[in-house]
Amino acid sequence: MATTQQSGFAPAASPLASTIVQTPDDAIVAGFTSIPSQGDNMPAYHARPKQSDGPLPVVIVVQEIFGVHEHIRDICRRLALEGYLAIAPELYFREGDPNDFADIPTLLSGLVAKVPDSQVLADLDHVASWASRNGGDVHRLMITGFCWGGRITWLYAAHNPQLKAAVAWYGKLTGDKSLNSPKQPVDIATDLNAPVLGLYGGLDNSIPQESVETMRQALRAANAKAEIIVYPDAGHAFNADYRPSYHAASAEDGWQRMLEWFKQYGGKKSL
C-alpha cells in the first residue's frame, strides 16, 4: 500500500480512503510553475484545456491545510475539463512545507498558524495577475477554496474588487482573532465584492451550525449576494475524496452548484 507521500498526498492527511478520484489529463495541459509575488517566486500548479478559443475564465483554487497536494491538483484538472484556467498557489511556501508534518495538530500549530492573512491575500492578487499574462481572462476571475482555503475564499471576496464569483467549501466563519488573522468571514460580510456560495456539512464538528447561522444573519443584515447550503448528512471535508470524511452525494451536488454559480456570476467573455 502506498504511503500518503508516495501517492502525492500530505502525510497529515492519512489515512487515505479508497474513494480517491483521479481525473484523466488527456484533454488538458497541466503542470507546475513559479509566480512572482512580493519579492519571492511562489510555486503553483495550473491546469487548462488543450483546446481553447481565446483567453480562459480563471479559477484560483485555494488549498486545504495540507497544501497543494494531489487532491487540490486534481481539483484544478477537473476545472480545466470544464473550460477554466485553474491555478493553485503554494500559499505556505515561505513558512514551511506541509509534508514535514505527520499529523494535523502539529501542522496547524507549526505551520498554518504562522501564515498571515494579509500575505495570502496579496499572493492571490499576484496569482490573478499571472493568469492575465498566461492565457486567462482577468475579467472572468473566480475563486474556490476548501477548509483553510474556504475561509480564505470569503476573505478574498471582500479583498479584490475585480473578483466575479466565489465558492467556499467548509471554511471557518467565526472564531478567535490574532495578529495573523485579524478578521473572520463574519466580520467582512458587509464588504463582499462578489457573490459567494458557501457549502457546509451539517455534521461538521469544527464548524458548528450556530456559526453558520451567525454568518447567514450577518449576510442578510448586509444585504449581501451570498448563499449558504448545508448538507445535513455531511461532515467536514465532505468533498475530500481521499479521506474517510468524503460524502459522495453532497460532494457531487456541491460541485454542480459551484459550476452553476460560476456560470451565473463569473462574468462575460471579453470581446
UniProtKB/Swiss-Prot annotation:
One Pfam family per UniProt: DLH
Protein name stated in the entry: Putative carboxymethylenebutenolidase
Gene3D superfamilies reported in the protein's UniProt record: alpha/beta hydrolase
Enzyme class, UniProt record, top EC level: hydrolase
Family annotation (InterPro entries): AB_hydrolase_fold, Dienelactn_hydro, Dienelactone_hydrolase-like
Top-level taxonomic group: Bacteria
The keyword Nucleus is annotated on this UniProt entry: no
Catalytic activity: 2-(5-oxo-2,5-dihydrofuran-2-ylidene)acetate + H2O = 4-oxohex-2-enedioate + H(+)
EC assignment: 3.1.1.45
Originating organism: Escherichia coli O157:H7
Family in the record: Belongs to the dienelactone hydrolase family.
Gene name for this UniProt entry: ysgA
GO molecular function: carboxymethylenebutenolidase activity
Active site, renumbered: 147, 204, 236
Keywords: Hydrolase
